[in-house]
C-alpha cells in the first residue's frame, strides 16, 4: 500500500524542530526506501548561513514553500568561473542543472522542498569552498553520498575546525564557514 501524501503545514507543525543547523534539512523521503526509487526529498528550513558549494551529478529541484531564498551558483564552464545569485521566491520553483556548484542560502522563517534524483552507483558529490577575495577554490571534499543529512554536516564541521583547510593557497585569505550578519540580502518574499 502506498503512503499518504505529505501535508507540509502539518508536517512542519509537528517536526520543525528537526530542521537544525548546519544543514537544516530533514529527508521526508529517503533514497534507501524502496518506495522512493532512489529519490531524495528534503524539507529545508532557515536560517542557514553555510558558505560551501555543493556539486551533485544529478539535477536538483527546488520549490520554495515559505519566504524567499538565495541560490548562489558558479558557472564553471566560463573562464574565469562566473558567480551568479538566483533568488527563489515563495511559491517559485527552480531546476538546477547537474554538476552546478551551488550554495543554498536560507533566511529566518523560510521553508523549501528540495528533490534530488538517484545518483549513479559510486557517483561522487563534492563540497567546495571558494575564496571571497580572489574566487579560487580554497578546499573541497569528495565523497560518495549515502546519507546527505549526516555527511554534509561532517564535512562542514571538518572544514570549520581546520584553519589550514580554510586558508586560500592563492591569496592567503581565511575562508569563513558562515556568512556574516547582513552580508547577504534576502530577496523579496514574492516575485514582483
Curated annotation (Swiss-Prot):
Protein name per the record: 3-hydroxyanthranilate 3,4-dioxygenase 1
Family classification: Belongs to the 3-HAO family.
Gene for this chain: bna1-1
InterPro entries reported in the protein's UniProt record: 3hydroanth_dOase, RmlC-like_jellyroll, RmlC_Cupin_sf
UniProt binding sites for Fe cation: 54, 60, 102
Residues noted as binding substrate in the record, renumbered to the chain: 60, 106, 116
Keywords carried by this UniProt record: Cytoplasm, Dioxygenase, Iron, Metal-binding, Oxidoreductase, Pyridine nucleotide biosynthesis
Gene Ontology molecular function: 3-hydroxyanthranilate 3,4-dioxygenase activity; ferrous iron binding
One Pfam short name: 3-HAO
Amino acid at each position: 500500500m502506498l503512503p499518504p501524501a505529505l501535508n507540509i503545514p502539518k508536517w512542519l507543525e509537528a517536526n520543525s524542530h528537526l530542521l537544525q543547523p548546519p544543514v537544516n534539512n530533514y529527508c521526508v523521503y529517503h533514497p534507501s526506501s524502496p518506495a522512493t526509487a532512489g529519490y531524495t526529498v528534503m524539507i529545508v528550513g532557515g536560517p542557514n548561513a553555510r558558505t560551501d558549494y555543493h556539486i551533485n551529478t544529478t539535477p536538483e529541484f527546488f520549490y520554495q514553500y515559505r519566504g524567499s531564498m538565495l541560490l548562489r551558483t558558479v558557472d564553471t564552464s566560463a573562464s574565469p568561473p562566473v558567480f551568479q545569485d538566483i533568488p527563489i521566491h515563495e511559491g517559485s520553483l527552480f531546476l538546477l542543472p547537474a554538476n552546478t556548484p551551488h550554495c543554498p542560502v536560507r533566511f529566518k522563517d523560510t521553508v523549501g522542498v528540495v528533490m534530488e534524483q538517484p545518483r549513479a552507483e559510486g557517483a561522487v558529490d563534492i563540497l567546495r569552498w571558494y575564496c571571497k577575495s580572489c574566487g579560487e577554490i580554497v578546499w573541497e571534499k569528495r565523497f560518495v553520498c549515502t546519507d546527505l543529512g549526516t555527511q554534509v554536516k561532517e564535512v562542514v564541521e571538518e572544514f570549520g575546525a581546520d584553519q589550514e583547510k580554510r586558508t586560500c593557497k592563492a591569496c592567503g585569505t581565511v575562508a569563513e564557514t558562515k556568512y556574516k550578519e547582513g552580508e547577504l540580502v534576502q530577496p523579496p518574499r514574492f516575485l514582483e
